[in-house]
Amino acid sequence: MRCGIVVNVTGPPPTIDRRYHDAVIVGLDNVVDKATRVHAAAWTKFLDDYLTRRPQRTGEDHCPLTHDDYRRFLAGKPDGVADFLAARGIRLPPGSPTDLTDDTVYGLQNLERQTFLQLLNTGVPEGKSIASFARRLQVAGVRVAAHTSHRNYGHTLDATGLAEVFAVFVDGAVTAELGLPAEPNPAGLIETAKRLGANPGRCVVIDSCQTGLRAGRNGGFALVIAVDAHGDAENLLSSGADAVVADLAAVTVGSGDAAISTIPDALQVYSQLKRLLTGRRPAVFLDFDGTLSDIVERPEAATLVDGAAEALRALAAQCPVAVISGRDLADVRNRVKVDGLWLAGSHGFELVAPDGSHHQNAAATAAIDGLAEAAAQLADALREIAGAVVEHKRFAVAVHYRNVADDSVDNLIAAVRRLGHAAGLRVTTGRKVVELRPDIAWDKGKALDWIGERLGPAEVGPDLRLPIYIGDDLTDEDAFDAVRFTGVGIVVRHNEHGDRRSAATFRLECPYTVCQFLSQLACDLQEAVQHDDPWTLVFHGYDPGQERLREALCAVGNGYLGSRGCAPESAESEAHYPGTYVAGVYNQLTDHIEGCTVDNESLVNLPNWLSLTFRIDGGAWFNVDTVELLSYRQTFDLRRATLTRSLRFRDAGGRVTTMTQERFASMNRPNLVALQTRIESENWSGTVDFRSLVDGGVHNTLVDRYRQLSSQHLTTAEIEVLADSVLLRTQTSQSGIAIAVAARSTLWRDGQRVDAQYRVARDTNRGGHDIQVTLSAGQSVTLEKVATIFTSRDAATLTAAISAQRCLGEAGRYAELCQQHVRAWARLWERCAIDLTGNTEELRLVRLHLLHLLQTISPHTAELDAGVPARGLNGEAYRGHVFWDALFVAPVLSLRMPKVARSLLDYRYRRLPAARRAAHRAGHLGAMYPWQSGSDGSEVSQQLHLNPRSGRWTPDPSDRAHHVGLAVAYNAWHYYQVTGDRQYLVDCGAELLVEIARFWVGLAKLDDSRGRYLIRGVIGPDEFHSGYPGNEYDGIDNNAYTNVMAVWVILRAMEALDLLPLTDRRHLIEKLGLTTQERDQWDDVSRRMFVPFHDGVISQFEGYSELAELDWDHYRHRYGNIQRLDRILEAEGDSVNNYQASKQADALMLLYLLSSDELIGLLARLGYRFAPTQIPGTVDYYLARTSDGSTLSAVVHAWVLARANRSNAMEYFRQVLRSDIADVQGGTTQEGIHLAAMAGSIDLLQRCYSGLELRDDRLVLSPQWPEALGPLEFPFVYRRHQLSLRISGRSATLTAESGDAEPIEVECRGHVQRLRCGHTIEVGCSR
């Protein structure tokens, strides 16, 4: 048997599709015939052998078995062998049912069955195939029955295994009892369908007999499939088969579509669709009948429902709209009188574009005459069926049976199918209609694709259309299939096919809700263009004093690398600083300062790939700082992550030139960056020389206060210049990381490569080309520069140089690479979007912050060994070190991209050995994570700090800030709460928590006089206070944040151990040598940790309230900006350690990480009474004593004020949003963005104003968003659910996308609901 070979089938193999088919009837006549012959042959062979072997006894007849003997004694009689033996005078004892010898009746029966089964495998091979196919149908939920004209076939079906797989059998005995005529009359098949509860028009017939196939065709069954293993396909097709297969394994069984009742309502879950539009522009396609019009008794009476014309008109003004109907095109145009639409008739065989141009399917025109003849024949054949309407259209014949009596419908459909089959036309079905069309591969889905190809690129970038198809009919399923992976299908619900299945993503209830949906979509699209585009950050005019700030704000990146938005023609200067950084590429240099040897590890500034300038007629090289600028505009497209610089200038010779540059760091190919430069001459003709280089002579000199330190991290470059490309190789001087940059520069005009002159340009550390081309006035030329950057740290890399060259060789042109990049960003925006309706400026800054977060930590980061650099990949402040900033970053990512958040935890887990060594050196068990780290997890905090106000170097004891470990533990537990991933706890999460908890238990020392555990000599989040007056660098005692969070970590470690399966828990305890005594001590510490208070306020640390009060007004009046109060006081010969003055939130961090209930519960465990009414006093106390010397301060203050519903929370939120764009830290943003503050602004929206918490395996919401600001919307993930949250004031709606995740519990201020996939709940909270 040939298995899986499709014979004589046009198009793909036949498919049993639950959208069109409810049941399958398998004809078994051939199987029964073959099995009966095999059964007779088995008995004949076995008994003839037995009678020959058996010794002759008196009265026994040993003659061979005859056909009459088989029929009388054995056919259909499992126990008939005893009667046969008696008739032959042979007497045998019954024996046992397990006998396998020939001296008992049972033995003979069993031995014969073995012979039968052996012959059956070769004689009836179809049996196993049919059984397997039937089981596939059952798994897919398709009802299945068997039909045969035979009687008494049970024993043969039992032997083939088929008796078990068919729930319904209709055989010759049943049809005889009912008086039904034999095949090819379809009566028997129709009775079988009836017993299955299926309509023949939605039922499939499968048979290998020509009479059975004819019966299927005569009965009007939806699909007739012939099984042919003997090359008789032509006869089977002529007998009525729609398709012929050699084996049922070739038939596809589809099961993935959903019942319409289970599909989410598009209006209720509109936010999901809106999210898809974050990075794409829609094109909307609609059916007419049942979608834009009500279903009516007479097709000619259909009209647009009220409001449809207005909705279509409004939507067409914002995006392409098409109506694709089964009606004739002229009919559609007459009923949809709205300008600006694509209109398609006859399922898209004929179309008219918005500009009036007419199109038709050329292949279909050959069928026009045949359709006309078919229409005439059908009119004649159906004239006796009352209510039947034959509608002849140019490219189809539709037979409507809405008004036909139920008992006549099957005959009508059968007649249409017979005629269509005979005429070579395609038969399709729809709402109370069966239709004949040209038998070519064309349907509404193909028409949708055809129109889509002619719409051109979407405004947001090439190939970023989102096709949306809305329809109600079975014929619309072709369109739903077309958009299944690239767009959105929306089915309009009706009951004429029951709760049928559909491939649509969403549903709408009726044409009126379709109008609501279209109007909502039009409104949203219109609103997006009415406002100043919140997807762009625009700088008008050139300002050298702000250029470095703009470079940081407009840096492009992809999680692997970041490249500052520097002018390509500019080298390092007071106004410009080219910088490119790859995550995790560090190098250490040594200096001698103030008699001390100082080692500093830095994120390395890599060779400048961007370097590009030009000159006209051999004049001066272009420099933005020296020409006369006539216009200048810089645009950062946040949606596309592309930076565009457009300028027009006049040079010393009076020549006016326009230059437009665009660049990106590919989110699709992380090692790739690209720059496109277009030069247009306005009033001159002459030569243009481009100089395109890769510059390896770069240093780390961005931060002024580091200039006294060594800055050259790269060795002398090796440069290889090729025809139109260059390869630069170098490595870091201490860490030995190989770096390769390959760049290709090509010139283009009107899509064609320009034949330009290339000359090598190179010196010690720079290499590339001078490229000359001639321009005439009004002409333009475009240089495309594509570069690839690799290091020896990259995975799956032979050498950095080979990889860079190979990647560059595979890279296409700029437009293609940019298109791939924009697509990747569209996918990211769909997962990470936040929408603030009507708040353009705030939304722009939120998107800027999201962009920089994703440019620093992206899905590519998950493939790297890299942490969260405090200043992103945008600059060199803090030397690119990893601090505790992941505490503000990871919770954002856990709820959006859990895999990326997991990679940040894995980064910390890989550095667990270093943290253990640090703890061991300090005399403790467990893990002590460093305050600052770079390449390997060692402590790399600076030993000396330069105060730029005083010019003095002072000791820097920041390595006492051990609370980084608390942040690591918090992120690990938050990740587990989001994902429910217990395997993470098994793999590494529990070990991480236990080792961090161990360290804090060891650091906490019992003070017998107080009966409390104390933690001494640390630095808290404040950072200002490194000690007490007179002991400036010894740390402070009992920092409240540290002590409380240490208890929190201990409890989470204990909980994590309890969550582990017994075997895994035992293995971990053995691995760590964790004793029962230790765990007892954990419990003791978690109940007796000391927490300082004064006057009902949580003290920042013990003794804080005894410090002097600062004259805040005096210092603000004298200095204005006092954010870095520590530097001001040190320059005055004073110390911030003397005062109740904090750099940033410290004690209030407890209210940032913990809910008030959690904090109060922890303090109660420790024996402290702390009431909710004490929280406002604590907040106010520290707000008045904080200089906000860190951008994180405003994040925490906004958080705690918003949770308390305080009116000034939004002031702090807006301060967070503007912290970098306004450079509120006084020039620090140019050194690198403040990544944690940017992430914090997102988290304020994502978790704070939503009240989103994860506690006790439950999602907790407590929305608190100012209603006047309009709705707040965003997607997130939780426990395998894809969720969308929409908040307005104190109410919210939460929608779960379709899927198979278990229901989740959602709590809102005491009220708990369960949310299932594909459903929406509303949470409204009483005041």
Curated annotation (Swiss-Prot):
<dbReference type="GO" id="GO:0016757">
    <property type="term" value="F:glycosyltransferase activity"/>
</dbReference>
<dbReference type="InterPro" id="IPR037018">
    <property type="entry name" value="Glyco_hydro_65_N_sf"/>
</dbReference>
<feature type="binding site">
    <location>
        <begin position="884"/>
        <end position="885"/>
    </location>
    <ligand>
        <name>substrate</name>
    </ligand>
</feature>
<feature type="binding site">
    <location>
        <begin position="1143"/>
        <end position="1144"/>
    </location>
    <ligand>
        <name>substrate</name>
    </ligand>
</feature>
<comment type="similarity">
    <text>In the C-terminal section; belongs to the glycosyl hydrolase 65 family.</text>
</comment>
<dbReference type="GO" id="GO:0005576">
    <property type="term" value="C:extracellular region"/>
</dbReference>
<dbReference type="InterPro" id="IPR005194">
    <property type="entry name" value="Glyco_hydro_65_C"/>
</dbReference>
<dbReference type="InterPro" id="IPR008928">
    <property type="entry name" value="6-hairpin_glycosidase_sf"/>
</dbReference>
<keyword id="KW-0378">Hydrolase</keyword>
<dbReference type="Pfam" id="PF03633">
    <property type="entry name" value="Glyco_hydro_65C"/>
</dbReference>
<dbReference type="GO" id="GO:0005992">
    <property type="term" value="P:trehalose biosynthetic process"/>
</dbReference>
<dbReference type="InterPro" id="IPR036412">
    <property type="entry name" value="HAD-like_sf"/>
</dbReference>
<dbReference type="InterPro" id="IPR011013">
    <property type="entry name" value="Gal_mutarotase_sf_dom"/>
</dbReference>
<feature type="active site" description="Proton donor">
    <location>
        <position position="1023"/>
    </location>
</feature>
<dbReference type="Pfam" id="PF03632">
    <property type="entry name" value="Glyco_hydro_65m"/>
</dbReference>
<dbReference type="GO" id="GO:0005886">
    <property type="term" value="C:plasma membrane"/>
</dbReference>
<dbReference type="Pfam" id="PF02358">
    <property type="entry name" value="Trehalose_PPase"/>
</dbReference>
<comment type="similarity">
    <text>In the N-terminal section; belongs to the trehalose phosphatase family.</text>
</comment>
<dbReference type="GO" id="GO:0009274">
    <property type="term" value="C:peptidoglycan-based cell wall"/>
</dbReference>
<dbReference type="GO" id="GO:0004553">
    <property type="term" value="F:hydrolase activity, hydrolyzing O-glycosyl compounds"/>
</dbReference>
<dbReference type="InterPro" id="IPR012341">
    <property type="entry name" value="6hp_glycosidase-like_sf"/>
</dbReference>
<dbReference type="GO" id="GO:0030246">
    <property type="term" value="F:carbohydrate binding"/>
</dbReference>
<dbReference type="InterPro" id="IPR003337">
    <property type="entry name" value="Trehalose_PPase"/>
</dbReference>
<dbReference type="Pfam" id="PF00702">
    <property type="entry name" value="Hydrolase"/>
</dbReference>
<protein>
    <recommendedName>
        <fullName>Uncharacterized glycosyl hydrolase Rv2006</fullName>
        <ecNumber>3.2.1.-</ecNumber>
    </recommendedName>
</protein>
<keyword id="KW-0326">Glycosidase</keyword>
<dbReference type="GO" id="GO:0005975">
    <property type="term" value="P:carbohydrate metabolic process"/>
</dbReference>
<dbReference type="GO" id="GO:0016791">
    <property type="term" value="F:phosphatase activity"/>
</dbReference>
<dbReference type="InterPro" id="IPR006379">
    <property type="entry name" value="HAD-SF_hydro_IIB"/>
</dbReference>
<dbReference type="InterPro" id="IPR005196">
    <property type="entry name" value="Glyco_hydro_65_N"/>
</dbReference>
<dbReference type="Pfam" id="PF03636">
    <property type="entry name" value="Glyco_hydro_65N"/>
</dbReference>
<dbReference type="InterPro" id="IPR023214">
    <property type="entry name" value="HAD_sf"/>
</dbReference>
<dbReference type="InterPro" id="IPR005195">
    <property type="entry name" value="Glyco_hydro_65_M"/>
</dbReference>
<dbReference type="InterPro" id="IPR023198">
    <property type="entry name" value="PGP-like_dom2"/>
</dbReference>
